[in-house]
Amino acid sequence: NQIKKSNTSTGARIPKAMTNPADNFAGGQWKPPGRRSARTSATGMFVCEHCLRAFTTNTGRGLHIKRAHEEQANEAITTERSRARWTNEEMEAVQAEIDCEGRTAINQEILRIIPYQRTIDAIKCLRKQQKYKTIRERVANRRAENRARETELTRLETADEDPASQEQDNPNMSLKNWLKEVIESDDDRLCADLRTAIEMALAGQSPLDVCTVGCYQYTMTNLPLVPVRLGGPIYWCNAQSRSNPGETQRRQTIKESNNSWKKNMSKAAHIVLDGDTDACPAGLEGTEASGAIMRAGCPTTRHLRSRMQGEIKNLWRPISNDEIKEVEACKRTAAGPDGMTTTAWNSIDECIKSLFNMIMYHGQCPRRYLDSRTVLIPKEPGTMDPACFRPLSIASVALRHFHRILANRIGEHGLLDTRQRAFIVADGVAENTSLLSAMIKEARMKIKGLYIAILDVKKAFDSVEHRSILDALRRKKLPLEMRNYIMWVYRNSKTRLEVVKTKGRWIRPARGVRQGDPLSPLLFNCVMDAVLRRLPENTGFLMGAEKIGALVFADDLVLLAETREGLQASLSRIEAGLQEQGLEMMPRKCHTLALVPSGKEKKIKVETHKPFTVGNQEITQLGHADQWKYLGVVYNSYGPIQVKINIAGDLQRVTAAPLKPQQRMAILGMFLIPRFIHKLVLGRTSNADVRKGDKIIRKTVRGWLRLPHDTPIGYFHAPIKEGGLGIPAFESRIPELLKSRIEALGASNMQTARSLLGGDWVAERKKWINTQKIKNSEWAQKLHLTTDGKDLRDTRKAEASYSWIRDIHVAIPASVWIKYHHTRINALPTLMRMSRGRRTNGNALCRAGCGLPETLYHVVQQCPRTHGGRVLRHDKIAEQVAIFMQEKGWLVLREAHIRTSVGLRKPDIIARKGQDCKIIDCQIVTTGNDIRIQHERKIQYYASNWELRRSAATMIGHQGQVSVEAITISWKGVWEPRSYCLLRDCGIPKVKIKGLTTRVLLGAYLNFNTFSKATYRTERRRTAN
């Protein structure tokens, strides 16, 4: 039997005669081919021992095993060494473990620490090497620096400041002086209640009374409040609507879905895409279990009186107006239990400063500001497990505003460990994921050992001890007044748990930070800094000149080491550090990955038979093909996996939901596509996959908007300002976002992140970016170069030309909104449109007998059948403009007939307001010529006639100059910029100008509809040029 070679000449399939197991028996015994089997005597082929596939070369067989049998290929790698080799991490660990000062028998001590595959002679040779001496000096210098730092910190914490310096630098003195200046200034903007409170404060009365009189009474009595509603899931239809049959049920369902959309667009979109993830059994079980976690803790430290040296005292300086305006309360944030809205709070700008400074002077705030409601957001539907809830505390708007100012002040001093990349002004997600990807790639390329531990901390934000927060603030040298205030807030705060419209009872948390409070992320980072200090400095993965021992993003910890012993030491240290802060790891949710080099074979093996331990519990060890997620990016042992854009199912759910096309487009652009952006940018993908995803989206949108199949591709992806639909294209968006995030690494304050720019990982990503076939900015040009899209090239010049497209609140009926798009992109079925690609002479002439090609422009703007519609459209626009101007106080004269020496002139509008008088004429023009030229021609038509201007002034009762203006709009709703500016200068709001645009488009579609239904044919026949 002869074997036919494959096209690649690297492999062939064994004929059936060869794959018969009996062929491998010799003398009654089975003889399987070896891992490096030689050529078979009969065929001269190399056979795979796993699937019996034959190859012409041994290299081809090896590549086949590596790709088709990954697990078997990984297990076949041998990592055992004939003799031990010393790594830099191991030498630093040994030197850090022993104390060389005044000790003897150091060689025996080293042998005791690392007994495996080591001898006394080997240790002696190692200690004579210059590399070991350099490491010994570096370890000694690091130990000396740490000792000096700890000594200084202990001295600052135990030593009190000199009383004279305390009095001179006391932050409260500057606050007291500021309050005196406010009282003496007689500022009218200061209300009586607040003035009384400041006077009481300066008189030394009770802080609680001062805060109650000055802060709470003023804000509660003088600001409008809103009732606080319990949050809950949104349902598309209730039980009653399900019982209604047929058309009634459909209408009721659509009505309720539209109401849900208006109440909470984001939640309604998530229900469409994910189902009702907020739904869970009603009752107080979830609130009681979560409340038990918050109440379990040690008593909070009481008021501190001793000040430590080196405090950053300017953190407690008086608050300025610039700071208040810089972090003004967001208008979209929810109100707290007191019902105060952000709009009301931001309206008392000068009083806010006085309130905040008085709070700082006393170190306390009104107790009602401390009350919050904690909404438990379930991570999984139907759960009652406390670990599966995400608590979000919503306190008073005033307290959140004040704490945001304090958080900004602390953040400006750079007090946090640079390894912590969460809640800072940096792209921490991109930095950490890129570093992890780069380290895995370097370990495989350079055959280096890499051990990774992905840790999960149990309810980290809810479990941190309050005493740990206080210790962390002391280490960061925050002033005594700020520390006392923060601890007073945590000692006196109350909250009420809410889950799915169910209220729990008021509780006083004894542990955890207040998630939702602007200060909480910074406080948690300070606590995590204490945990990171426990990591051994000699352990980590050496990448270039930097050693990376951990990647940290809030409570997401990834530990790295070059040796197994190094990673186990880091795990033990981190476990001890977390326990000191009242935190604990969840071993069942932790994972480790061991990439072990094989020096002889020049390969990397994923080991799984030697697990790591945390708290005497083994951690799950990831295998060769196992996957895990870190910061939203899915990894395996080779790095980020290839991301598939599985968007078809989500699009089908959006299509099946009872939504209007405007709502579907909003969900697509605002919620669905952004779900894929993160993992596509930071993960891996291919050009073929992103183009396939774009094709699926375009196909679905064509169905939603009933667009023909040959609609220009640029119309889907061009920005709305350029006349398109503004749908982000994966093909162009992903490479540009990846490029911008890579460039941002160069501005990072972390040296290891900046060093990535010269590495292999970034070079590989840049190489893929350069394969980009179209840029994001080229979609507009792609649209404007087509026959259907060239008329939209001036859209960006006036906001009214495109503002109607994003109609997320469904102000325009759905069927009409679709027809507007058909009109703009020439999608209405004219003969010229329908005969594309199969047109012959004469078969596309106008059905009205005009003798001209039946284009959409001809039907709407030229054909005699639609003349009456064009007149009505023009008159309606002029009428609406006149009404809008009258509403703004203009005296308007409509369609005045003025006879001049050159003939009768009938300007649409003559308007006067004060000393301003205008002659305005409206026109709806074609876009074939420059719309600017047509606009100037219309103005010149009236401006050159001095008799017209004089008669118009006389008719309207004006004595001064008369200006001539024109309102020029194309029949596709594109405005001439000066026309738009004219109406805005006249005081007409944008929303009404947008209505003029849609009225023009509606008139164009009605003209086409009239043309299609009419049977009138003109007697005068013309032939096309």
Curated annotation (Swiss-Prot):
Gene Ontology MF annotations: endonuclease activity; RNA-directed DNA polymerase activity; zinc ion binding
Entry keyword Hydrolase: yes
Biased composition (Basic and acidic residues): 146-158
Comp. bias intervals (Polar residues): 1-11
UniProt cross-references to Gene3D superfamilies, sorted A to Z: 3.30.70.270
Ranges of residues in domain Reverse transcriptase: 358-635
Primary enzyme class: transferase
Catalytic activity: DNA(n) + a 2'-deoxyribonucleoside 5'-triphosphate = DNA(n+1) + diphosphate
SUPFAM superfamilies: DNA/RNA polymerases
Cystine residue pairs: none
Region (Nucleic acid-binding endonuclease): 755-1025
Zn finger spans (C2H2-type): 46-69
Record InterPro entries: DNA/RNA_pol_sf, Rev_trsase/Diguanyl_cyclase, RT_dom, Znf_C2H2_type
Region of interest called Disordered, as start-end residue ranges on this chain: 1-38, 146-172
CDD domains: RT_nLTR_like (cd01650)
Protein EC: 2.7.7.49
Keywords: Endonuclease, Hydrolase, Metal-binding, Nuclease, Nucleotidyltransferase, RNA-directed DNA polymerase, Transferase, Transposable element, Zinc, Zinc-finger
Name assigned to this protein: Retrovirus-related Pol polyprotein from type-1 retrotransposable element R2
Species whose genome carries this gene: Nasonia vitripennis
